[in-house]
Structure formats: C-alpha cells, structure tokens
C-alpha cells in the first residue's frame, strides 16, 4: 500500500504539469490565431529595460504597424521597414537609410513576431489566471539562447497586454501594449521610396 501511495505521489505532479502545459498552449494558440486572422494592426507600446545587477532602468515609447510578415517600426528616432525580404532603417536626423536583406534567423523578439515564437523549440507553462488576463511562460530548449524565459500577459479577448524577456545577464526587457488598433493595411505601405527623400545617404549592404 505504501508503495502504491509513493507511486501515486510521484505521478501526480507529472499530471499537473502536463495539464498546465496544455492550458498554456491553448492560451498561446488562441492568441496567435486571433492575430493571424487580422488584416493588419497598429500598436503603440512602451519598451523598458532593467538590469538588476547594474541598477539600470531605461524606458521609451514606440509604434509598430504589422501585416502578415511585414512591419513598420518607429522607435528612438528610427523608422524601420521590413517587407519580409528587405529591411530599410531610416535615420531622419542624418537623412540616412541602411538597406539589408532580411534574415529571419537574426530577427530579435518583438511585437511583430512574438505571437508565433512559442511554436517551435519552447516549453510552455501556465502560471495563473486573474480577472481579465492570464499569465503564461515559455522557456527555450536551445541553451545557447541569450534569454531563458519569456512571460506573456494575455487578455481574456486573446490580445497581448505585455510580454517580458528575461536574459542571462540579469536584464529584463518589458514590452507593454499601450493601445491597439486592428486595421486593414496595404502592402505598398511596407516599402521605402528613395525618391521621396532628396539627397538621402544610402548605405546598401545587399
């Protein structure tokens, strides 16, 4: 009898973790499907970086428009356009644009791709649900990643309220969605027309 109880106690946490993983995956899938069905969206956000070791905290605002694999990002004086093949980074103060080929493997975690990132190479864990939102964490299976955890705060309407990246240097990167607008965006919006910028300096790495 004691042996049976011991086996049961060992097996019980496994069941609990499995159920938590399923809840987490269901929440992430519902969020992802919600964004995938949109014809486009524009979001304002606040980006905060904290380093607990160095006692550093920095914060600034940004704006992003997304359609499928394309996006336009405005942040810290930069306008970054990605049409899923080419990336233009425009610095208005310098009237300078840098052009490069888009490499998905080099893409940072951001509001344009975080809805899909959990699908491959991550473990999932449900943390809790409170009034209005749920919290889910994912952990990369690749130990060479610079971060060890991403925390999602998902609203009950399957929109993302915020996500937080925890890296191995004891830094925390928080992306908080300030406002969100679902809207239809034309593909022509996601390109950089050099003719509209007289005397611009072009740095082409392609």
Model-assigned labels for residue ranges:
Residues 4-12:
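Sec-dependent N-terminal signal peptides
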Residues 19-40, 44-49, 55-57, 86-148, ...:
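Flexible, processing/modification-adjacent segments and terminal tails
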Residues 42-45, 59, 73-75, 165, ...:
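Extended beta-sheet lipid-handling architectures
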Residues 48-50, 67-69, 76-78, 85, ...:
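Solvent-exposed coil/turn segments that connect beta secondary-structure elements
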Residues 59, 68, 75, 119, ...:
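Short beta-strand-initiation
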Residues 61-108, 173:
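An acidic-aromatic
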Residues 122, 129-198, 203-206:
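Gly/Pro-enriched, hydrophobic low-complexity segments
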